């Protein structure tokens, strides 16, 4: 069996490693660098990858693609993709299937297709070093990548001519690299991985029994749209805003200038990790009728920290959730490991140390640890490493939609993979001949708030009263974290299977909502209380509106009366149901319908007040001096 290489396919940089003897070794690329920029450029008849692509970016911004990992497995409509469209110099377009694709040199390409160019370079780098063809690889992904994003990463490998032997989570890979040669018994480590575009936290237990090491992931959490690129964008926006204040020119409309500012911002950010201030100096950045314009802006470390403080803070929330899911406190953590280039920022290191109450380990290379761990896993799969067992987990719960729009979970989040789970369901109506299996990923009880991974039909069910047929649904989650689903009619033996295909990524907001609201969904009492409150509000609204209608009498036009009566009867109908959202919507609809009634009630109240007012008030107006006034509109409301 040939060598299985380990590849860290990063947002900003990628790295390849291989097992050399019993130790992982990072391989230098053709340019002599240990990491390769994840930048791809399309020029006339040539595709450039890495440093050569980065070097020509200033003169070819619209055909130079970077941070493609932020788009992999995502839908065009995703909020994060829409945000990226505004800041990326290249074109992000909507594919026929709704995915986010890119366009360069007039050609539309899928994200896995572009990422495959980076993987091809990694493959070639390894082949040049080993002197033989390489076909097998272990590729890493952020722990919080969903099914679609994992599938898309596997597709990229296949396009690059690689057989992807395993997809493993980046923090887990880093733990493998770190713990492989560590002696001294059991330890519980926290891997804080802040890369170019994604953030993960994993709590991992390393057990050693008679020389065999088990790496067990206890919990994982993260944010698939938070990373160094976001830090860069904050600094880019600051520089552009400062330049606009000084020169009155908006550089955002100039792709060439923006590419120069991007490079300068990235360089300044790196410099500010080791110095307290730096100058961003870009001569001839643009020009207008008065001549050329130069950018010269001083940036201090304190300024940069103030620009990104909320991003660092955002990374701390998943730490709390991961510890709670692992049922541990900060005192139970033996070692803290920092992975990803953005963790070189002193502020990030300080905040993480403050959170865990201990300094992070300094003996881990944040740019290389993930690829080295992937190479170790490659060695395990190739049979070169015998004494290592890796137990990873699924980051989000998996289930299907059942009657009433409820998500029934078959696999809970943080379940060790591979895993298999099955459950028997039945029909919702008499003589139902087919069922639709709607597969979901997420933590919400209501199906509509989770990520839809796909659906399929099981047909040919024999006619029977509802609840009688037995349909067994099986979820098979493989070691790559990719889901295979089957549904079987136990009476007829008819079966339908699918492997969930990439249909788009999870948005940050969706993930955030899933985590935050997961706890709330466990509390049936809370749900009941909310429903009761909604019903009470509906009752009050109906009673109050009817009372106002009586008082308004003939002042309310007949068509308005009819509109309100319709809204009241719709609210009364919704009130009988169990759907709080439906009740709230109908309350809102009644408020809208009763707007005219509110105006009449207000006019009647004002008329009554006017009757009782002092008739002599008019004479006082003679002494009043007219004043000019200006209406101030508050746009923030």
From Swiss-Prot:
The keyword ATP-binding applies. Residues 623-637 have a biased composition (Acidic residues). The modification Phosphothreonine is found at residue 198. GO terms for molecular function: ATP binding; ATP-dependent protein folding chaperone; unfolded protein binding. The keyword 4Fe-4S does not apply. Pfam families: HSP70. Keywords: ATP-binding, Chaperone, Nucleotide-binding, Phosphoprotein, Stress response. Induction: By stress conditions e.g. heat shock. Signal peptide: none annotated. Residues 600-637 are annotated as: Disordered. InterPro entries: ATPase_NBD (IPR043129), Chaperone_DnaK (IPR012725), Heat_shock_70_CS (IPR018181), HSP70_C_sf (IPR029048), HSP70_peptide-bd_sf (IPR029047), Hsp_70_fam (IPR013126). Residues 601-618 have a biased composition (Low complexity). PANTHER family: HEAT SHOCK PROTEIN 70KDA (PTHR19375). This is Chaperone protein DnaK. It comes from Vibrio parahaemolyticus serotype O3:K6 (strain RIMD 2210633). The lineage of its organism: Bacteria, Pseudomonadati, Pseudomonadota, Gammaproteobacteria, Vibrionales. The gene is dnaK.
């Amino acid at each position: 069996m040939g060598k299985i290489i380990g590849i860290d396919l990063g947002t900003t940089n990628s790295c390849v490693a291989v097992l050399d003897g019993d130790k992982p070794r990072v391989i230098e690329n053709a340019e002599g660098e240990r990491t390769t920029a994840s930048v791809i450029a399309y020029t006339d008849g040539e595709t450039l990858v890495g440093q050569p692509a980065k070097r020509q970016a200033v003169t070819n911004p619209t055909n130079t693609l970077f941070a493609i990992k932020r788009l992999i497995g995502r839908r065009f409509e995703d909020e994060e993709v829409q945000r990226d469209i505004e800041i990326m110099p290249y074109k992000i377009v909507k594919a026929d299937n709704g995915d986010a694709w890119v366009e360069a040199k007039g050609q539309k390409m899928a994200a896995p297709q572009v990422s495959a160019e980076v993987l091809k370079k990694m493959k070639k780098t390894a082949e040049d070093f080993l002197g033989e063809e390489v076909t097998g690889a272990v590729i890493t992904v952020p722990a919080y990548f969903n099914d679609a994003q994992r599938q898309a990463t596997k597709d990229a490998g296949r396009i690059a001519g690689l057989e992807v032997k395993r997809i493993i989570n980046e923090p887990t890979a880093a733990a493998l690299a770190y713990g492989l040669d560590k002696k001294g018994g059991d330890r519980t480590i926290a891997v804080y991985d802040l890369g170019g575009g994604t953030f993960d936290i994993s709590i991992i237990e390393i057990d050693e029994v008679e020389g065999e090491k088990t790496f067990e992931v206890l919990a994982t959490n993260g944010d698939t749209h938070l990373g160094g690129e976001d830090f860069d964008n904050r600094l880019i926006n600051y520089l552009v805003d400062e330049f606009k204040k000084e020169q009155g020119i908006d550089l955002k409309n100039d792709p060439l200038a923006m590419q120069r500012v991007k490079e300068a911002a990235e360089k300044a950010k790196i410099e500010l990790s080791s110095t307290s201030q730096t100058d961003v100096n870009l001569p001839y950045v643009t020009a207008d009728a008065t001549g050329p314009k130069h950018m010269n802006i001083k940036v201090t470390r304190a300024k940069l920290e103030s620009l990104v403080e909320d991003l660092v803070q955002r990374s701390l929330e998943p730490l709390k959730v991961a510890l709670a899911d692992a049922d541990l406190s900060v005192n139970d953590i033996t070692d803290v490991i920092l992975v990803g280039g953005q963790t070189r920022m002193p502020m990030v290191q300080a905040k993480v140390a403050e959170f865990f109450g201990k300094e992070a380990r300094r003996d881990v290379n944040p740019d290389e640890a993930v690829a080295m761990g992937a190479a170790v896993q490659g060695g395990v799969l190739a049979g070169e490493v015998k004494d290592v067992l890796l137990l990873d987990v699924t980051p989000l719960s998996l289930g299907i939609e059942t009657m009433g729009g409820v998500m029934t979970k078959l696999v809970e989040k943080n379940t060790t993979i591979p895993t298999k789970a099955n459950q028997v369901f039945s029909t919702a109506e008499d003589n139902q001949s087919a069922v639709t299996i709607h597969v979901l990923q997420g933590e919400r009880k209501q199906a509509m708030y989770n990520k839809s991974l796909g659906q399929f039909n099981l047909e040919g069910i024999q006619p029977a009263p509802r609840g009688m047929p037995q349909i067994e649904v099986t979820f098979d989650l493989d070691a790559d974290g990719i889901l295979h689903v089957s549904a079987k009619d136990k009476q007829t033996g008819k079966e339908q299977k699918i492997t969930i295909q990439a249909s788009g990524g999870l948005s940050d907001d969706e993930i955030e909502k899933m985590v935050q609201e997961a706890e709330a969904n466990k509390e049936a009492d809370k749900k009941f209380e909310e429903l009761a409150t909604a019903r009470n509000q509906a009752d009050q609204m109906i009673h109050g509106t009817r009372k106002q209608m009586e008082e308004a009498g003939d002042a309310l036009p007949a068509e308005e009366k009819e509109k309100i009566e319709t809204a009241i009867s719709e609210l009364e109908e919704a009130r009988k149901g169990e759907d709080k959202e439906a009740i709230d919507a109908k309350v809102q609809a009644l408020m809208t319908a009763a707007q005219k009634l509110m105006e009449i009630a207000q006019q009647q109240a004002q008329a009554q007040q006017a009757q009782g007012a002092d008739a002599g008030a008019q004479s006082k107006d003679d002494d009043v001096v007219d004043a000019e006034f200006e209406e101030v509109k508050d746009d923030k409301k």
